[in-house]
From Swiss-Prot:
Pathways involved: Amino-acid biosynthesis; L-lysine biosynthesis via DAP pathway; LL-2,6-diaminopimelate from (S)-tetrahydrodipicolinate (aminotransferase route): step 1/1
Residues annotated to bind substrate: Y13, G38, K102, Y126, N176, R364
Function of the protein: Involved in the synthesis of meso-diaminopimelate (m-DAP or DL-DAP), required for both lysine and peptidoglycan biosynthesis. Catalyzes the direct conversion of tetrahydrodipicolinate to LL-diaminopimelate.
Protein name: LL-diaminopimelate aminotransferase
GO biological process, one term: lysine biosynthetic process via diaminopimelate, diaminopimelate-aminotransferase pathway
Protein family per UniProt: Belongs to the class-I pyridoxal-phosphate-dependent aminotransferase family. LL-diaminopimelate aminotransferase subfamily.
Catalysed reactions, as listed in the record: (2S,6S)-2,6-diaminopimelate + 2-oxoglutarate = (S)-2,3,4,5-tetrahydrodipicolinate + L-glutamate + H2O + H(+)
Cofactor(s) annotated in UniProt: pyridoxal 5'-phosphate
Modified residues (N6-(pyridoxal phosphate)lysine): K238
Protein residues bound to pyridoxal 5'-phosphate: S101, K102, Y126, N176, Y207, S235, L236, S237, R246
CDD domains found in the cross-reference section: AAT_like
GO molecular function: L,L-diaminopimelate aminotransferase activity; pyridoxal phosphate binding
Disulfide bonds: none
């Protein structure tokens, strides 16, 4: 039976290909070290796990949850936003729970995009921005993220006819895969642009708490008027090592939050309530665990940067995310460099072209691996590459 066009149009998911490659090498007896997928290697903090255990003892929490989330969970999210960013949110109308931010990012296009509609997406960028658009029948206009512009989209370069047709704009800072950060000045430009062209801004802020060297990432919603034109997606996955728990939220524009909630009520049955209680504990409990995690990633970041720079790269230390974005050496494409490292060194990296055409010529290293294994991976890379040129 022929699949629907929307499914046939989907590109192969980047990380699915990486997982298959790892499996093939392991079956061949290779000791593979993966620096590919950004999945934290340290455990969820103990007090969050204990809260899950306690909440799971209550039989009521094993019934169907609300598709938009318990009010107490949404209140905890709103209170966290007030403490962290000074942003006031109505937990009843401006917060919705998500099965991880990925789910909401994929579904928001279903709320606003009709077949043929246009969506602005960053390139390179998280593949789900485009995937959700394709599933909704829309088309994407790629906003190039260039190093000379700090990996921020140049809004002035977007053609007038494109801007007028666009329904949504996806942005993401701190940025995956580049590690770039954005200030409030940039977000102000985005709000102005969105108001001018009546575009809904969808800011993916999943890495806002993974920052270094005293830097604190702002929320898009801190900008005056941002709630008029946008929503922000966030998650407990990266901040508290809860990727497998599948819990996050969207906040901001009440109409967009309502649309997302109505869509979800027809598709899923919400987040397991015991996990929502654990999420409340994460947001309201001790935050020193987040600082400890960032300190660990900073150490690993420094290790990678120092090693690669010794080999001939000229990399600056990113202020956010747990990724290193670097150009491939002379003579390689993104794909051929990734293939070289897996074949010669048994080390998996993510080829930059998997994030879009503007990712060609780059690769991404994830810092979510035990430091001892990271050191071994870097030793293997140094052994098989030596000095490199660009």
């Amino acid at each position: 039976m022929l699949e629907a066009t929307r499914v046939r149009n989907l590109p192969p998911y980047l990380f699915a290909r990486i997982e298959r490659l790892i499996a093939e090498k392991k079956e061949a007896g290779v000791d593979v070290i993966s620096l590919g997928i950004g999945d934290p290697d340290t455990p969820t903090p103990k007090h969050i796990i204990e809260e899950l255990y306690l909440a799971a003892q209550n039989p009521e929490n094993h019934q169907y949850p609300s598709s938009v989330g318990m009010l107490s969970y949404r209140q905890a999210v709103a209170a966290w936003y007030a403490r962290r960013f000074g942003v006031e949110l109505d937990p009843k109308t401006e917060v919705v729970s998500l099965l991880g931010s990925k789910e909401g990012i994929a579904h928001i296009s279903w709320c606003y995009v009709d077949p043929g509609d246009l969506v602005l997406v960053p390139d390179p960028g998280y593949p789900v921005y485009e995937g959700g658009t394709i599933l909704a029948g829309g088309t994407t206009y790629k906003m190039p993220l260039k190093p000379e512009n700090g990996f921020l989209p140049d809004l002035d370069s977007i053609p007038e006819e494109v801007a007028r047709k666009a329904k949504l704009m996806f942005i993401n800072y701190p940025n995956n895969p580049t590690g770039a950060v954005a200030d409030l000045g940039f977000f102000e430009k985005v709000v102005h642009f969105a108001k001018k062209y009546e575009i809904l801004v969808c800011h993916d802020a999943a890495y806002s708490e993974i920052t270094f060297d005293g830097y604190r990432a702002p929320s898009f919603l801190e900008v005056k008027g941002a709630k008029d034109v946008g929503i922000e997606f966030h998650s407990l996955s990266k901040t508290y090592n809860m990727t497998g728990w599948r819990i996050g939220w969207a906040v901001g524009n009440a109409k967009a939050i309502d649309a997302l909630g109505r869509l979800k009520s027809n598709i899923d049955s919400g987040v397991f309530q015991a996990i929502q209680y654990a999420g409340i504990k994460a947001l309201e409990g001790p935050q020193d665990v987040v600082k400890e995690l960032c300190d660990l990633y900073a150490q690993r970041r420094d290790l990678v940067i120092e090693t690669l720079n010794k080999l001939g790269w000229n990399l600056s230390k990113p202020k956010g995310t747990f990724y290193i974005w670097a150009p491939v050496p002379k003579g390689f494409t993104s794909a051929s460099f990734a293939e070289y490292l897996i074949e010669k060194a048994g080390v998996v990296i993510t080829p930059g072209n998997g994030y879009g055409t503007n990712g060609e010529g780059y690769f991404r290293i994830s810092l979510t691996i035990p430091t001892s294994r990271l050191k071994e991976a870097l030793q293997r890379i140094e052994q098989h590459l030596g000095k490199v040129e660009f």
